[in-house]
């Protein structure tokens, strides 16, 4: 069931179905994007995403490997998934879902880039160059 929610998340973004996409989140959910400044409430994330959802496709991520764990209580799940994206290549999604009266809802989603260790020093140096 948790996997179906995540599949639906990606499918509704790909079809730009804004109403269903945002209904998959809890009202107090957080979306954490790839930039260090991207820690959004749902209201902030929706405002950011609105222009994307006015297109035929908001964005497309395809899950190719996913691990889901459910707490012994049965009402909290966490996951990580490897995603493919045409612009970014391989990315990673991770997060937390909670079981609500309306089914599983995403409480937190984190989108990140997996940085190969072989280039990590170079990536960190470039990030630091952008700091004031």
Language model features with spans:
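Short beta-strand edge/turn micro-motifs at domain boundaries
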Residues: 90-122
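Residue-level detector of flexible, active-site-proximal loop/helix-junction positions
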Residues: 36-38, 68, 113
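A short acidic, helix-capping loop that chelates divalent metal ions and anchors anionic groups
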Residues: 31-33, 117-118
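Short, low-complexity N-terminal intrinsically disordered segments enriched in polar/charged residues
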Residues: 1-27, 43, 75, 118-132
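Short, hydrophobic secondary-structure boundary micro-motifs
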Residues: 22-23, 32-33, 61-62, 107
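A mature extracytoplasmic/lumenal domain signature
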Residues: 35, 82-83, 95, 110
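Surface-exposed, charged secondary-structure patches
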Residues: 1, 30-31, 43-90
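Short active-site-proximal "capping" loops at secondary-structure junctions
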Residues: 28-30, 36-39
């Amino acid at each position: 069931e948790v996997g179906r929610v995540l599949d639906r998340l990606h499918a509704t973004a790909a079809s730009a179905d804004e109403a269903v996409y945002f209904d998959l989140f809890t009202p107090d959910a957080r979306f954490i994007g790839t930039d260090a400044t991207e820690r959004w409430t749902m209201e902030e994330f929706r405002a950011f995403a609105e222009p994307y959802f006015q297109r035929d496709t908001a964005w497309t991520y395809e899950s190719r490997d996913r691990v889901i764990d459910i707490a012994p209580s049965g009402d909290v799940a966490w996951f990580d998934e490897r995603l493919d994206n045409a612009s970014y290549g391989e990315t990673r999604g991770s997060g937390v879902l909670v079981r609500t009266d309306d089914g599983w809802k995403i409480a937190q989603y984190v989108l990140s880039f997996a940085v190969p260790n072989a280039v990590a020093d170079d990536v960190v140096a470039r990030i630091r160059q952008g700091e004031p």
